Amino acid sequence: MSKFSSKNINKTKVPESPVVLAILDGWGHREENLDNAIKNANTPIMDSLWHAYPHTLINASGADVGLPNGQMGNSEVGHLTIGSGRIIQQELVRITNVVKNNQLTQVNELKEMANSIKKKKGTLHITGLCSDGGVHSHIDHLLGLIKWASEEHIEKVAIHIITDGRDTPAKSAYKYIRQIEDCIKKFKVGEIASICGRYWIMDRNLIWERTEKAFVNLTDPNGKKIDISPADYLNKSYNANITDEFLEPIRISKDFLKDEDSLICFNFRPDRARQIIKALSEKEFDNFKRKSIPDVDILTFTQYEANLPVKIAFPPESLNNFIGQIVSENGLKQYRTAETEKYPHVTYFFNGGVEVPSPGEQRHLIPSPRVATYDMAPEMSAEELTISCSNAIKTGQYSFVVINFANPDMVGHTGNMAAAIKAIETVDRCIGKIVNATGEMGGSILITADHGNAELMKGPDGEPWTAHTINKVPLIFIEGEKRKIPNMGNEIYLRENAGLADIAPTLLQLLNLPIPKEMTGKSLIKEIELKGFNKVVQHV
């Protein structure tokens, strides 16, 4: 049991006014107007809030979120850092250190898989996102696995490439394929067996027909091998205006998953690897009809979901005393809401990888629109999300509310400037309504983001920029009339040079709850001039 359990803390009565955390996913800060969807959008609400209320810019990338210096942040890492109130060494760093130190041969689950493959004389299949984006995977980990397979004398290795084009430039796959081919040549093991764009195999929105298409490419014994080189396939696709993210699944060797084979998925981020691994591993599966279900041993780099019938190379480290846990153990109710694309982030990731809600934690999912890409519906489900969350706030039941607006990130990923501007303007309208609902209840609200994206829509080469950024993100604090900061005077300020890890301690201070020692972040609140909500209402 946590040291901050309800047994040893004086319980606070449920207040009539909430503390709200609004996360504008992908809303970064960048001064330049050029190629900046946020600066070019009409945002009267956010502009008014920024000028009228205490604000600061906080770090959301690199070492400030447990990633290598210069590595862009992402939604998983951002929500994990916010919810934990500390900087946690991320899986990218953890696994990279093992690979760089040539320690894959010391990983027990990899040892067991190597022995099993050699005993069965089967094929080792390796799949994962092949890029250096560092959000879901890293190509260095694949190259390390090829070297490991050579050292373990595994004879048959089939590599199933997932192309990126979302966390990397849209037409950058050839660079990574060349690295793979060079590594295969150097260590004299492996071949490229198939290619598939991440759009198909890494869906997380329960659009199972995408997953099915990738599944068939990996498993169908009657699947047709296409006589084409990876480079020629890329050129053919680019000429047809199909970029890396959307490459059609193809098989370029005779290797497919079959009985007695083994599979390693080297993605370390769970959310976009779950659906394909479920389809490949679960006996009870009804999301689509599987014509061929190969009996293969599966090893994933990290835990994608509790109780999946797979082995894990790098099991999760035990984490304790996240903000949701502290709120729950003090008898307070909390409300988490997002649309489908970001629902795992305000629940699973925000809670440190815990699937099950804490006592008193209410979750509400708003379905994302079923479109091919979100530039086709830049408003997404923000309006429905806003109505639902506003109603929850006004019930007075919840002490702590977390809402995520997905639009800046999901539409920013499309590289469509006009659509991103619409997405930003939608969120601007919606955040005003959330602020007003909070104000009506006398509550306080923190508005921030988990990482940047929509503030940069083109790269230096003039091509659409579909990845995240390393820019700082805004944070605005509005104190409610019934949610005054305990033991503070009339003037307070927000700290500068802060990071996402400082948000949870700030929220706990607003909730008048103790900050556990595990939270190494520090409250953002110093002396600032307090103002009410009256200046916001007139703009909404």
Curated annotation (Swiss-Prot):
Any Gene Ontology CC annotation: cytosol
Residues given in the record as Mn(2+) 2 binding sites: 25, 75, 450-451
Cofactor(s) the protein requires to work: Mn(2+)
Its EC number(s): 5.4.2.12
Catalytic residues (UniProt): 75 (phosphoserine intermediate)
Transmembrane helix listed as a keyword: no
Self-association and partners: Monomer.
Name of this chain's protein: 2,3-bisphosphoglycerate-independent phosphoglycerate mutase
Lineage: Bacteria, Bacillati, Cyanobacteriota, Cyanophyceae, Synechococcales
